[in-house]
Amino acid sequence: MIVADLKSLEEIAASVAEYRKILVLGCGSCVTVCLSGGERETQQLTRELIRSGLFGGKLPVFESGTVIRQCEKDLVETYQQVPPDTEAILSLACGCGVQTVADTFEPLPVIPALNTTFYGASNEAGVWREVCQGCGDCVLSHTGSICPVARCAKSLFNGPCGGSQNGRCEIFTDNPCAWAMIYYRLKKQNKLHLLHEVHAPRDWQPAGGAGPRVRIRTGIGGSPQK
């Protein structure tokens, strides 16, 4: 099972402040079990955003809904309740769910409300492709909902390496270059300016660099105790 924690209300509000109509979309699977992103938490976060006072008098229109599993594209495709004129989706799913929803409703921006943290075991026969490593500090709002940690063979944060050719990965040539995917996704969204932003050096402690991690449920939607 994938475990995720709610981002701070301030970070969430800042990430969606430019949009006028937002769908807050929960997930009925892992994050429901860990009390971070189910129907109850989705409704609670929507209420908290509306009354937060963090939008400077320009409060967006918020609507909410829940998909059984955001990480399964066929289930996301059956979701027919995206309101007209929706400008962005605020996803309460893990990084896999955020990226699946973004692929399904492209080029609609999909913003993560959670930080995916770590994974539990699930014994199920099937095939999965890794798109999230649970780094604990989700950057998908800056990369077009495509994870450079998991989908770049070198986990680069500053663009493609010199070996990327024709949109393919230097290490695994059958795979697309993650940063080429990020570039074209942001281009479709008219958000190439995000590639010019300067970010602080990466802190890998939330990814487990400080030893085994413990999650304690407290506060709204299971946000971690500070």
What are the language-model segments listed below?
Residues 91-95:
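N-terminal glycine-rich "phosphate-gripper" loop used for MgATP/nucleotide binding
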Residues 97-100:
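Short, well-ordered alpha-helical microsegments
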Residues 69-70:
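Membrane-embedded and interfacial regions of multi-pass energy-transducing membrane proteins
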Residues 1-66, 77-89, 103-142, 146-226:
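Iron-sulfur (Fe-S) cluster-binding modules
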